[in-house]
Amino acid sequence: MITPQNVFRHEFIGLNVEVINSKHEKFIGIKGIIIDETRNTIRVDTGKNEKLIPKSDVVFLFTLPQGEKVSIDGKVITARPEDRIKKKFTKIR
């Protein structure tokens, strides 16, 4: 089960996400379902089209399957998905 404490160690594909802060204004407000993830980017299906978002420039708001919302700075998750899942993270408040 995905919780706010272990979300970093899970697959992001299929989760709902929204960009809540960014260095570039054009990314703020993008929301949809994650359909692909690479080391540096997340691809989001917005319902109208697909958007490719650089992880390092944004803060994401993930909606977990139970409805909980978790805000994550993209710099923290900039890694290949298979490496991020294995990585140990310090406790996040």
Curated annotation (Swiss-Prot):
BP GO terms, sorted: rRNA processing; tRNA 5'-leader removal
Listed GO CC annotations: cytoplasm; ribonuclease MRP complex; ribonuclease P complex
Pfam families: RNase_P-MRP_p29
EC code(s) of this entry: 3.1.26.5
Localization per Swiss-Prot or TrEMBL: Cytoplasm
GO molecular function, one term: ribonuclease P activity
Keyword terms of this UniProt record: Cytoplasm, Endonuclease, Hydrolase, Nuclease, tRNA processing
TM region(s), chain numbering: none
PANTHER family reported for this sequence: RIBONUCLEASE P PROTEIN SUBUNIT P29, RIBONUCLEASE P SUBUNIT P29
Official protein name in the record: Ribonuclease P protein component 1
Gene name linked to the record: rnp1
